[in-house]
From Swiss-Prot:
A motif (DDXXD motif) lies at residues 288-292. GO terms for biological process: diterpenoid biosynthetic process; sesquiterpenoid biosynthetic process. This is Valerianol synthase TPS8. It comes from Camellia sinensis (Tea plant). Mg(2+) 3 binds at residues 452, 456, 460. Mg(2+) 1 binds at residues 307, 311. SUPFAM superfamilies: Terpenoid cyclases/Protein prenyltransferases, Terpenoid synthases. Binds 3 Mg(2+) ions per subunit. Its cofactor is Mg(2+). InterPro entries: Isoprenoid_synthase_dom_sf, Terpene_cyclase-like_1_C, Terpene_cyclase_plant_C1, Terpene_synth_N, Terpene_synth_N_sf, Terpene_synthase-like, Terpene_synthase_metal-bd, Terpenoid_cyclase/PrenylTrfase. Pathway: Secondary metabolite biosynthesis; terpenoid biosynthesis. One of its GO terms (molecular function) is magnesium ion binding. Disulfide bonds: none annotated. Terpene synthase that catalyzes the biosynthesis of the terpene valerianol.
Length: 554
């Protein structure tokens, strides 16, 4: 997102030239200003949820079920969005299932691919060799595969768990997409199955926003003749109760942002309180992480305005002053800043003080220092891009990416996200791990940076913008824009492969932490899939309404 425009003072006193972005305004008005939680409805949902949870827990741990049936139950729980209630029981079951798995079982493609996806999602490195029996002597898929729509759909979803060196999964990905696309809307698919296929082709399970995907799956599962009514009821109640919590939290955040009144002082910036909360809810949606969602949202909002200050308003001289002030992190530095920057700087210091006080009450404020240092690092990199723009410099792609992996916010978002987790999960060692520049955090940052570079390129260049990764690659390699886009998407796919590999056991840190990095990567896939949905929030408006406003009919 970040780069810069500049404009030097003309004749000493004239207003400097500013390359204003004219970002779209907030969509929401006062829509989320007030919300009263219906405590009676909340309690009603909660009481029934507790009863159903115990029934489902008994189902998960019950013996006598075949392995294929058990893996399918786990899959349904995950896709319905209720597996977080049974994490311990599911992990115990998967450990046993993986240890006993035999690929010589007479499993069909759907079942094999389902095992592969679920095991990989939980860190178990199942080999691609399990798919060999579906290929002929020439290595091509057998004709029977093309006739198995459910099997192809299951394989398609499994291919998103690929790591580097797994060429078969690349082939399977291309094959299943081609086959499924040819079947959509045709006479061989029921309308319900066709709808599932179309949604899967638009948004894979592995890269989707977990809560949104759960809501989609609930609507599909409701039409499944083999559905389990207990699971369906639990999923609906759980979604609706959690939606009430999220809506109440969003109301608090929205009011806080309005009272802060920062946008009135920096009207050039994007006003995106709702979208930042949406982003934070992807990082962690579970009810116990309400503090984390608030912390992450507030820091993201400050970063967004800071980004726009460097990207679409501040002059180079002003930006140098602001960079120095952030490095000092002291209220006395405010005296050197222009008035509009004083408002932003004051908000930055105050919000971090507020966050530190809130986390100190729970004994987990030790991560705040790491978040501050990450913020300082990003601002330094923003200034580098401002200088590049001022000089008209087009960096080599390697030089660009070295700086872009900082401005991609991977370290800051990961650090700030970890601050909202339990102290026994987000330990001091976890924050020290981030400082080692781990491959997974770098990969997550690369995904966000490169997909944003592609999706926002034309608009940013039109108003005046530092050379993006797309520009740097085109110049260095002498290729067209379309050729460069193809290469950047190859890099994005490799970054996803790295994320998948880093989540295979044994992992460097707890899976409870790694899943947050994965979730931060997922939001890039959702928000920037077709256009920059953060800058143009109408693109994700339906997602926001679905997640925070529209309950599931009971």
């Amino acid at each position: 997102m970040a780069s810069s425009q500049v404009g030097d003072m003309v004749n000493g006193n004239a207003e400097p030239t500013r390359h204003l972005a004219k970002f779209p305004p907030s969509l929401w008005g006062d829509r989320f200003t007030s919300f009263t939680l219906d405590k009676q409805l909340w309690d009603k949902y909660g009481n029934e949820i507790e009863v159903l949870k115990e029934q489902v827990r008994s189902m998960v741990v019950a013996g006598g079920r075949k392995a294929a049936e058990q893996i399918n139950l786990i899959n349904v729980l995950e896709r319905l969005g209720v597996s977080y209630h049974f994490e311990k029981e599911i992990e115990e079951q998967l450990e046993q299932l993986f240890a006993k798995f035999e690929d010589n079982e007479d499993y069909d493609l759907f079942t094999i691919a389902l095992h592969f996806r679920i095991f990989r999602q939980h860190g178990y490195k199942m080999s691609c060799d399990v798919f060999n029996k579906f290929r002929d002597s020439n290595g091509e898929f057998k004709e029977t595969v093309s006739n198995d729509v459910q099997g192809m759909l299951s394989l398609y979803e499994a291919t998103y768990l690929k790591i580097r060196g797994e060429g078969f999964l690349d082939e399977a990905h291309a094959f299943t997409i081609a086959q499924l696309e040819s079947l959509v809307g045709g006479p061989h698919l029921s309308s319900d199955l066709s709808e599932q296929v179309m949604h899967a082709l638009k948004q894979s399970i592995h890269r989707g926003f977990p809560r949104l995907e759960a809501k989609h799956f609930i609507s599909f599962y409701e039409k499944d003749a083999s559905r389990n009514e207990t699971l369906l009821r639990l999923a609906k109640l759980d979604f609706n109760q959690l939606q009430l919590s999220h809506r109440e939290e969003l109301c608090h955040i929205f009011r806080w942002w309005k009272e802060l009144d920062l946008i009135s002082k920096v009207p050039y910036a994007r006003d995106r309180a709702v979208e930042c909360f949406f982003w934070s809810t992807c990082a962690y949606y579970e009810p116990q992480h309400s503090v984390g969602r608030a912390v992450l949202t507030k820091i993201m909002l400050l970063l967004s305005v800071t980004d726009d200050t460097y990207d679409a308003y501040g002059t180079y001289d002003e930006l140098k002053l602001y960079t120095n002030a952030v490095q000092r992190w002291d209220v006395s530095a405010m005296d050197e800043l222009p008035d509009y920057m004083k408002a932003l700087y004051r908000a930055l210091l105050n919000v971090y003080d507020e966050v530190e006080r809130d986390l100190a009450k729970q004994g987990r404020d030790y991560g705040v220092h790491h978040s501050k240092e990450a913020f300082k690092e990003i601002v330094r990199s923003y200034e580098i891009e401002a200088e590049w723009f001022k000089e008209g410099y087009v960096a080599s792609f390697e030089e660009y990416m070295k700086n872009a992996l900082v401005t991609s916010t991977g370290r800051l978002h990961t650090t700030s996200c970890f601050m909202g987790l339990e102290a026994d999960v987000a330990t001091t060692e976890a924050f020290e791990w981030i400082l080692t520049k781990p491959k997974m955090v770098a990969a997550s940052g690369a995904i966000g940076r490169l997909v944003d570079d592609v999706m926002s390129h034309d608009e940013e260049q039109e108003r005046g913008h530092v050379a993006t990764g797309l520009d740097c690659y085109m110049k260095q390699h002498g290729v067209s824009k379309q050729e460069a886009i193809v290469e950047l998407y190859k890099m994005i796919e490799n970054a996803w492969r790295d994320i998948n590999e880093e989540m295979l056991k044994p992992t460097a840190i707890s899976m409870k932490l790694l899943i947050r990095v994965l979730n931060l990567s997922r939001i890039s896939d959702v928000v920037y899939k077709y256009v920059d949905g953060y800058t143009h929030p109408e693109i994700i408006k339906d997602h926001v309404i679905s997640l925070f406003e529209d309950p599931i009919p009971m």
